[in-house]
Amino acid sequence: HLRTRRQRQMCIRDRGEPRLTAALNYVADAGEAESSAKGMFTAESKGNTTAQLGYGTKKWGAALGYRYGQCGAGFGTAYKAVKQSCGGGNVDSQNFALNGFWKPEETGFIPSVSLAYGWSDLEGSTVEEAQTWMVGLQWDKVANTPHSLAVGFGAPLYVESQDGTNPDAPELAWEASLKYKVSKNITLIPAIFYLPESNSSQGVSGKEQFGAVVQTVFKF
């Protein structure tokens, strides 16, 4: 019985100790192509090589990510100016991301904070640099209730510099949500969001958008 208690105490202490994690993966968008020039690990694989290193606890943490994208690999962005076709050149990209979060010891007026920043450097392209960033805040147990409030704002991946005149940076996009616990098994999550008018210098043009959504979660 004493040994079991000590093991439990050690386990509780270990949960608060910082942990180091690492991950590495490779995806080839053209991995199943019939041409022998494509496939995996070739110059025309449209490959993504991603590595990530993280360190932290349940209360705080940070992660550094790196991605090498070959010609034709997608960026996952709505801004057309960032998307570059292969053409006759060898376009590739070096991409870096830094993310972190922090939670207060006790819930209250001070929120938990999430931060993220990404930067891309393109070679063989008219676009030279692109970046993205976001800030997220969350208040748990608002006013001593089981509900939580979250707010986030930032900018999607956009062109920072290019050949010729650099485009204007997009305006802020934001969203807010309330996690409302109706009962032990039912939660309502109403949310609102705002997307600014698209910047024509970023390769797209469109009107601003304001919307709302309600999600219902059932647990059995």
Question: In which residue ranges do the predicted regions lie?
Answer:
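Repeated loop/turn-to-beta-strand initiation elements of outer-membrane beta-barrel proteins
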Residues: 18-24, 49, 59-64, 71-73, ...
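Single conserved hydrophobic/aromatic residue that forms the stacking wall/gate
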Residues: 1-14
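Transmembrane beta-strands of outer-membrane beta-barrel pores
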Residues: 19, 26-32, 57-59, 66-72, ...
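Outer-membrane beta-barrel "beta-signal"
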Residues: 208-220
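A beta-strand-loop signature enriched in Asp, Gly, Thr, and Trp
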Residues: 96-155
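Membrane-embedded beta-strands of outer-membrane beta-barrel proteins
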Residues: 51-53, 98-100, 135-137, 176, ...
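Surface-exposed beta-loop-beta
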Residues: 30-98
